[in-house]
Amino acid sequence: MSTSTASNVHAFDRRLIARMTGALGDDKVIGRTALELAQVFDELLPGVLQSETGCDVTIAYAGFRTGLRNELIAALGDGVLLGDLSLRNWCADFQVGCDSPVLIALVEALLGAEPTSIEEPAPRSLSKIEIDVALPVFHGIAEVLRTAVNAPGGFEPVVGRPYNSAERAKPDPVLQDVFAASIDMTIGLGPVLSTFSVIVPQSTLLKTRVVSRKGAGEDRNAKTEWTEQLEEQVRRSAVALEARIRLESLTLDTLSRLQAGDVIPFHDGQDVRVEVSANGRDLYVCEFGRSGSRYTVRVKDTHGSEQDILRHIMS
């Protein structure tokens, strides 16, 4: 190839190729599909979540954004819970992101707090138990989405375990990012107003025909499988407990010379006091004891009410 010929070779514009192959659409077309999906969320999701939580959850369309998928996800910011989902015969890889404040408020409501009395929580990463509680919420969003799209076969969506945005792996620079759209919805519980986003490749949205099914989720009084799953998640969530016993005070000189096999007595001669904690929070005042061949602690007092302890464990 001559120098003059090489100088006339130009790389194809990536956006142009994406438009030619159906991977990028006009904002007007994408916006129309986003609005249709938002109308289904607005129509069905409040009823689904109200029947599960007993709370009046408000849903409203907050607009849409377009761009590269990884950039749209990064723009959600910190304090967001993310989930990777797929729906056979519709989209093999899409994401849902939800601001943490409304999920924290939902946990408070499930623990018995009046939604109207919940103060707006600050965005933060969620604990393992809070994520356990949030998982069925992601299932609810996915189920409403399933009712809205034309996915043949009636397959159920696959919802990966949600994770905090700070834990999301960095994109592989070798893999080319895809053009996507973020459908943004506000979700309100009491005075707490947050946003959840559904991020879908534009190639999928351009082929999507939205079908509204008004009958879905109309029975708000029925205790559904979603509720049972939520309760089971909470019941089966394991909590690591720690016990702390005060030992006899030692001088710095003695402490520095301790060797393997040396014994340090408990501070309390009788009724040895044990502080039991979880997630860095003191929960119970206990008494050290023994049952058969196992050492145990007996609860003697609590640090707060049952609701206080649950909130400490969940946070």
UniProtKB/Swiss-Prot annotation:
Membrane topology field: Peripheral membrane protein
InterPro entries assigned to the protein according to its UniProt record, in alphabetical order: CheC-like_sf, FliN-like_C, SpoA-like_sf
Cell inner membrane among keywords: yes
Primary residence: membrane
A GO biological process held by the record: bacterial-type flagellum-dependent swarming motility
A GO term from the CC aspect: bacterial-type flagellum basal body
Coiled-coil ranges from the UniProt annotation: none
Signal peptide, first to last residue: none
Disulfide bonds: none
Subcellular location: Cell inner membrane; Bacterial flagellum basal body
Pfam family of the protein (one): FliMN_C
SUPFAM superfamilies attached to this UniProt entry: Surface presentation of antigens (SPOA)
Keyword Cell inner membrane appears in the UniProt entry: yes
Assigned keywords, A-Z: Bacterial flagellum, Cell inner membrane, Cell membrane, Chemotaxis, Flagellar rotation, Membrane
Protein family membership: Belongs to the FliM family.
Function (record text): FliM is one of three proteins (FliG, FliN, FliM) that forms the rotor-mounted switch complex (C ring), located at the base of the basal body. This complex interacts with the CheY and CheZ chemotaxis proteins, in addition to contacting components of the motor that determine the direction of flagellar rotation.
Protein name per the record: Flagellar motor switch protein FliM
Organism: Rhizobium meliloti (strain 1021) (Ensifer meliloti)
